[in-house]
Design a protein with these regions (language model features):
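Positively charged n-region of N-terminal signal peptides that target proteins for export
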Residues: 1-4
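Bacterial N-terminal signal peptides
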Residues: 7-16
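Short pre-active-site segment immediately N-terminal to redox-active cysteine/selenocysteine motifs
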Residues: 54-56, 61-64, 132
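Thiol/disulfide oxidoreductase modules built on the thioredoxin-like
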Residues: 105-113, 119-140
Length: 140
């Protein structure tokens, strides 16, 4: 788990210099996770309450964001194969302002094996931050 934390921290710090926008996080270290529900045609529904007791990596991205593409490629290559079968780990990759159809089309090209969740109106991502992607949160 230490490697996950180090990987996430390194990714966050390295990508801050490439971010499209800047804004303070709404969620701060020590805060409880905001209540939310994500719906995906391909991956079903997940509620924040379902995540209790798990280590959760939340990644917020957009299909047009260059740094997001680099980060997700690394997640696919390094992180997902190692932790995808760990019942105490959950990864939520959330497409900010994207629909299910847009994410399905995007994933045809990218061939990611981790689940993608749409957030077309920023109803979930807006509870974490209003700007700046990619953005990742490690929650335990």
């Amino acid at each position: 788990m230490r490697k996950v934390i180090l990987f996430c921290a390194a990714t966050l710090f390295s990508l801050l210099s490439f971010a499209q926008e800047s804004d303070a996080d709404i969620v701060k270290v020590g805060d409880n996770i905001p209540a939310f529900t994500l719906h995906s045609t391909a991956n079903g529904t997940i509620n924040s309450a379902d995540l209790k007791g798990k280590v959760v990596l939340i990644n917020i991205f957009a299909t047009w964001c260059g740094p997001c593409q680099s980060e997700l490629a690394e997640v696919q290559k390094i992180l997902w194969p190692k932790y995808k079968n760990n019942k105490d780990f959950c990864m939520l990759v959330i497409g900010r302002e994207h629909t299910d159809d847009q994410l399905a089309e995007y994933n045809k090209r990218k061939r990611f094996t981790f689940p993608l969740y749409p957030d077309p109106k920023r109803e979930v991502t807006g509870k974490f931050a209003t700007k700046m992607i990619p953005r990742s949160y490690l929650i335990n």
